[in-house]
Regions:
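Preference for the N-terminal adenyl/adenosyl cofactor-binding alpha/beta module
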Residues: 1-24, 92, 163-392
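A short, conserved, highly charged catalytic patch centered on acidic carboxylates
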Residues: 1-118, 126-167, 171-182, 196, ...
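Short, small/polar-rich loop/turn modules that mediate ligand/substrate recognition or access, typified
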Residues: 123
Length: 392
């Protein structure tokens, strides 16, 4: 039950100082707004913002980004036992989120890339809830895909409605997912899910790369060889792009390799060798196909991973989504079409079944129940010696 007296006091305090907060000449920033208003609002909605329950990091209800550090992630990740359910993006009151479209586009991009169906944007003066089933476009206005908009003077009056959308009890009871299923359909209409779109993009590269190599003959006349080398090259490019968005160290950015067409292939090979030395994962240790591909096809592939061609934020896309994409990717293989070009076809053992991934919530529960006690008190080296069987 939300404490209406506390909520009214919060609203009254904001109202008494709103002119100061909204004056851009004053030094009232997002940091202060989060501490004084947005954190308390989330707490009144039941969320343990400060982790007063002392939960382990992987099970925190709210993951808040550092107040004083500007990151490329949403300010709050709201979770169900550690599984992200929606984001909250915060702005200072001087930012008019009802007129300035940039915060809305940013919020929608965050939600879409995480495959969430709603996201919250607030400067406390307003609380906006966005439908994030749709790709955000740079020319969208701030009202596009906006599902609800509340002024702070409405918070007390409409608290039941707000609670029914984003409160902790709503999420933990299952009502949140039921509401989304009824009101935020993930398919149909103009919706395009991030995993479906990215898989389609990968398959386009797969076919383009394969046809270019197949035309050269030799070892590339083998579909088995093509399957392996093309998959490996795509993995390498996507891995490097993910490293960039996650701010992991690289010799230089992937995009830097395409600034000079004459140097593209040597620069990319140099980047691959550098990544192999740094990460020692074996991903870059094999024979690469860089010099067997045209600069045009490589450049097009890399450009597809950057703005403005790309809608993807790889620091937001969850690993489980990438895993799902990989699983579906592996259900198809290269096939030789009647016109002697390469296309894609379902593998025989996948033709009559679909890929169903285990929901993250269930994975976390299973791991907690089966491995937590086994790993308790062990050193990292001891944990590495544990054998785990996945019966499925």
């Amino acid at each position: 039950m939300t404490n209406l007296t506390e909520l009214q006091n919060l609203v009254d305090r904001f109202h008494a100082n709103i002119d100061f907060y909204k004056d851009a000449r004053n030094a009232y920033n997002e940091h202060s707004c989060r501490i004084e208003y947005i954190d308390p609002l989330l707490k009144l909605l039941g969320w343990d913002v400060a982790n007063e329950k002392g939960l382990a990091p992987q099970y925190r209800e709210v993951i808040a980004e550092n107040y004083s550090t500007r990151t490329d992630r949403p300010d709050y990740t709201i979770t169900l036992r550690g599984v992200p359910k929606f984001f909250v993006e915060a702005k200072k009151p001087a930012v008019d989120i009802t007129r300035d479209a940039d915060p809305a586009i940013q919020t929608r991009k965050y939600g879409w890339n995480a495959k969430h169906r709603l996201a919250v944007l607030t400067n406390f003066e307003y609380l906006a809830i966005y439908d994030t089933c749709h790709i955000a476009h740079e020319d969208d206005g701030c009202a596009v895909a906006r599902y609800r908009l509340y002024h702070y003077t409405e918070y007390v009056e409409k608290i039941d409605e707000i609670v029914g959308l984003i409160a902790r009890d709503t999420v933990y009871s299952g009502d949140f997912d039921a509401y989304l299923d009824a009101n935020f359909p993930a398919t149909g209409g103009q919706t395009q899910q991030v995993d479906t779109l990215f898989l389609s993009q990968i398959n386009e590269w797969r076919v383009a790369l394969s046809n270019e190599l197949y035309a050269q003959g030799g070892r590339y006349a083998s579909l088995e060889v093509l399957n392996d080398v093309v998959q490996e090259f795509i993995n390498q490019i996507v891995f490097l792009r993910i490293c960039e968005d996650k701010n992991l160290p690289l010799y230089h950015k992937l995009k830097d390799t395409i600034t000079d067409a004459d140097q593209l292939q040597p620069k990319l090979e140099e980047l691959f060798r550098s990544a192999d030395r740094r990460y020692n994962s074996g991903m870059f240790s094999g024979e690469d196909i860089i010099f067997d591909l045209s600069c045009e096809v490589i450049k097009g592939m890399i450009e597809d991973l950057y703005y403005p061609q790309s809608p993807y934020l790889f620091n937001i896309i969850e690993p489980n989504l990438l895993g799902k994409i990989c699983e579906i990717f592996l259900t198809e293989q290269l096939v030789l079409l009647e016109n002697n070009t390469i296309g894609l076809g379902k593998k025989k053992d996948c033709q009559n079944r679909s890929v169903v991934t285990t929901p993250t919530e269930i994975v976390k529960y299973m791991v907690d129940k089966t491995l937590s006690k086994v790993c308790e008190g062990k050193t990292p080296s001891e944990i590495l010696n544990i054998s785990v069987a996945d019966i499925a």
